[in-house]
Amino acid sequence: MSRPRRQALKEQRHDQVREEILEATMSVLLRKGPGGFTLNAVARELQLTKAALYYYFDSKETLLFELIYRGLDRQTQTVGDAVEATDTGADALEAMIRATAGYYGARMDELRLTYMMPQADSAGSMSMTDERFERLRPFNDRIFGAVAERIEADQKAGRIPGHVPARRLAFVAHTSVLGMLLMEGLVESVDDPLLHARPAMVDELVRAFHARLLPGG
């Protein structure tokens, strides 16, 4: 076997084990919560030694951040692709709303991990650094920036009122979807589901934000 081939296989195996560790971390967090999240618990999940984990992640903080980063990266790819397939501001805004609802609606545990656990993490399992913020910021540009570009293009063409704050509107629409899903997850966790079906609520959000793009909106 050639050296490049051996190196490629080594890198492939490294990536595979890294993914297995991230999946095991998710399992531990879902079962035990932030307070029960330790490297020892993850190691036991995989039948590895704690020392073996350090080969892939240098700390518990790094492991947790990379798990959240992976989820945001996947969400951004899905939603960003949906937005990029559109031509108008209204279509881009709708694509972002529907793709976000579709992505996290099928991954409610990932939604809770990404947006709720850091706030509830009294154990201090993860702190943010400038380097970590720099890695996360491109996700905002990929989604909010792409929606804003299409809204602004429509504004220049006179199709959308010029006073509409394009990027802020995209951000608020995104957080509205997340809020809807988090509320859905909250009531379902206590066996008291919402009266309104998710598709109907998503439709309402689309109509509300489309209205913001109309004259007088």
Identify what each model region corresponds to.
Residues D73-D81, L113-M116, A123-A157, R168-V172, ...:
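Amphipathic alpha-helical packing segments from all-alpha helical-bundle domains
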Residues E20, A24, V28-T62, E66:
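Helix-turn-helix
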Residues M1-R5, G102, D141, G145, ...:
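C-terminal peripheral helix-coil segments that are non-catalytic and often amphipathic
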Residues T38, R112-M116, H163, L186:
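Short, hydrophobic secondary-structure boundary micro-motifs
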Residues H14-T25, V42, L67-G71, Q75, ...:
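Generic hydrophobic, amphipathic alpha-helix propensity
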Residues E66, G80-R112, E134, A166-A173:
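Hydrophobic alpha-helical connector segments
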Residues R98-G105, M116-S125, R212:
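Helix-loop "lid/cap" segments that line or gate small-molecule binding pockets
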Residues A24-V28, Y103, S176:
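Short amphipathic alpha-helical elements of helix-turn-helix/winged-helix folds
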